[in-house]
């Protein structure tokens, strides 16, 4: 990549690369390279990304009910914009992932996500709010309907890393509410549940355990 760092104007960076994806149960001829190309601007608590931005640029790894490891493997970048605002007590983050550009072969699809965190000593509170939109292919392809999914996930946790010999030790719990709507059939579905997570890391060893109780 190429970067220009100015104490007055901030950091400007243009990054380019590629990620190799080998589909499971396929031969090497079916593998594909997915380009990574984005512009970054960073200054005094603001960090902006535009383009094909790796998910690892997010402040935290997304929970698996938002982005499972299998989806992340095949879809390693978000395509759109990522805005991050950081301060001494926490952060606020917003992104738009436009992963389906409407055409005769592709349905229009995008996801909006807002997440944040507020910290007070070893305690923290935050959460996620997301909206996913799936629409039709371009005309004259037949209509397949328009689907929308909204979810909210408030959570609280404790970071015990500073008072233990571990590099990372966090425990958190939260509630997730999901609402799905299918416009074509005028149907809707509401699901909800509680979850708890524990994460421990010491050097190159890590352990993560997730618990969920609720409905799909």
Residue spans for each PLM region:
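Residues that define the transmembrane beta-barrel architecture of outer-membrane proteins
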Residues: 1, 29-35, 75-81, 106-112, ...
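Beta-barrel outer-membrane channel/assembly domains of diderm bacteria
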Residues: 1-41
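A generic structural signal for ordered secondary structure
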Residues: 12-17, 49, 153, 157
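Short glycine-rich beta-strand segments
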Residues: 21, 53-55, 176
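Active-site beta-strand termini and strand-to-loop segments that position acidic
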Residues: 41-43, 85, 200
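Gram-negative (and chloroplast) outer-membrane scaffold detector with strong preference
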Residues: 45-47
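Surface-exposed coil loops of outer-membrane beta-barrel proteins
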Residues: 49-117, 131-133
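Exposed, low-structure sequence patches enriched in small/polar residues
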Residues: 87-91, 99, 105, 113-120, ...
């Amino acid at each position: 990549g190429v970067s220009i760092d100015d104490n007055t104007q901030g950091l400007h960076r243009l990054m380019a690369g590629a990620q190799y994806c080998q589909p499971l149960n396929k031969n090497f001829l079916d593998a594909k390279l997915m380009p990574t190309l984005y512009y970054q601007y960073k200054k005094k608590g603001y960090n902006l990304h535009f383009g094909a931005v790796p998910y690892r640029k997010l402040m935290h790894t997304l929970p698996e009910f938002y982005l499972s490891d299998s989806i992340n493997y095949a879809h390693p970048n978000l395509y759109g914009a990522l805005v991050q605002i950081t301060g001494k007590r926490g952060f606020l983050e917003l992104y738009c992932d436009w992963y389906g550009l409407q055409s005769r072969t592709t349905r229009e699809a995008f996801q909006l996500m807002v997440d944040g965190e507020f910290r007070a000593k070893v305690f923290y509170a935050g959460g996620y709010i997301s909206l996913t939109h799936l629409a039709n292919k371009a005309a004259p392809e037949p209509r397949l309907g328009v689907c929308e999914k909204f979810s909210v996930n408030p959570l609280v946790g404790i970071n015990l890393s500073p008072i233990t010999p571990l590099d990372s030790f966090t425990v958190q719990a939260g509630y997730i509410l999901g609402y799905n709507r299918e416009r074509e059939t005028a149907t809707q579905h509401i699901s909800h549940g509680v979850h708890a997570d524990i994460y421990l890391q010491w050097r190159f060893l890590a352990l993560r355990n997730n618990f969920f109780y609720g409905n799909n």
